[in-house]
């Protein structure tokens, strides 16, 4: 990646991060008024569990994907770069499904451990987003490897806007049934915002599909094609130290 491209990419992601934090502040203040301290407590109990599992399931894989894709594109190996994306997509989808199942399975145990059944609904509400974020990580890594930071920035802002609009709306609509429902509504907003963000990045990918396919067609075939296992192994080796 050239110096200008790196600076431009860092600037785009930096702006997206600032905008995301700004929107996030607008989310937290009214949410506290809607679901009150007990609801915020439930939200804050559920969210760290989600983040912990998300970190385990994705680790540094988006960065590893970006690195391997960029290295292959620099050599003109567009076909191999796209193959890395396809393999990482499948791997992250499987990891996302496993993480979702684990969270759903341990939720009753976690609730029993902290002696608070009200946390069950919020945790189950956020479990599916582990899959959607994991899959989106593959797309983000691929685009970043192509020196395209825009898709990552757009999806980050989409997530925050979705969480703000959908999360607050559902929290307000459901809090009358109980604080756990209000907290779950806010968290469903997080899940749906990830679904929307995934849809956005798939749309962006499809817009660039003809360009990607042209690069694949004109890419020379490698004499030695790395196996899927070796690609996964390399991804993990790069990702683990991150």
Report the location of each language-model feature.
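Membrane-interface helix-loop junctions in multi-pass transport and translocation proteins
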Residues: 149-150, 161-204
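Small-residue-rich midsections of specific transmembrane alpha-helices
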Residues: 44-70, 131
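Alpha-helical transmembrane segments of multi-pass membrane proteins
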Residues: 117-139
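Helix-terminus/linker motif at the lipid-water interface of multi-pass membrane proteins
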Residues: 22-40, 111-112, 173, 239-242
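Short membrane-interface helical motifs at transmembrane helix boundaries
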Residues: 98-118
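Membrane-interface junctions at transmembrane-helix termini in multi-pass inner-membrane proteins
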Residues: 132-155
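Interfacial/gating helices of multi-pass transporter permease domains
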Residues: 31-55, 179, 183-184, 229-235
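N-terminal membrane topogenesis motif
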Residues: 1-23, 79, 83, 222-242
């Amino acid at each position: 990646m050239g110096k200008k491209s790196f600076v431009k990419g860092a600037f785009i992601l930096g702006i997206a991060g600032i905008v995301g934090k700004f929107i996030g502040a607008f989310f937290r203040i009214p949410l506290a008024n809607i679901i009150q301290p007990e609801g915020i407590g439930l939200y804050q109990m559920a969210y760290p569990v989600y983040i912990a599992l998300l970190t385990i399931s994705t680790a540094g894989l988006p960065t590893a994907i970006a690195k391997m894709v960029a290295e292959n594109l620099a050599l003109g190996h567009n076909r191999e770069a796209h193959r890395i994306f396809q393999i990482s997509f499948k791997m992250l989808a499987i990891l996302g499904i496993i993480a979702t199942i684990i969270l759903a399975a341990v939720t009753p145990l976690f609730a029993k451990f902290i002696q608070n059944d009200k946390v069950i609904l919020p945790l189950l509400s956020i479990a599916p987003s582990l899959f959607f974020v994991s899959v989106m990580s593959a797309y983000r890594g691929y685009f970043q490897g192509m020196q395209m930071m825009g898709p990552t920035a757009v999806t980050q802002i989409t997530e925050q806007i979705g969480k703000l609009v959908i999360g607050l709306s559902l929290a307000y609509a459901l809090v009358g049934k109980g604080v756990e429902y209000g907290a779950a509504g806010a968290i469903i907003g997080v899940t749906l915002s990830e679904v929307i963000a995934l849809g956005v990045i798939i749309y962006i990918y499809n817009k660039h599909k003809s360009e990607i396919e042209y690069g694949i067609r004109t890419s020379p075939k490698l004499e030695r094609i790395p196996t899927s296992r070796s690609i996964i192994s390399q991804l993990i080796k790069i990702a683990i130290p991150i």
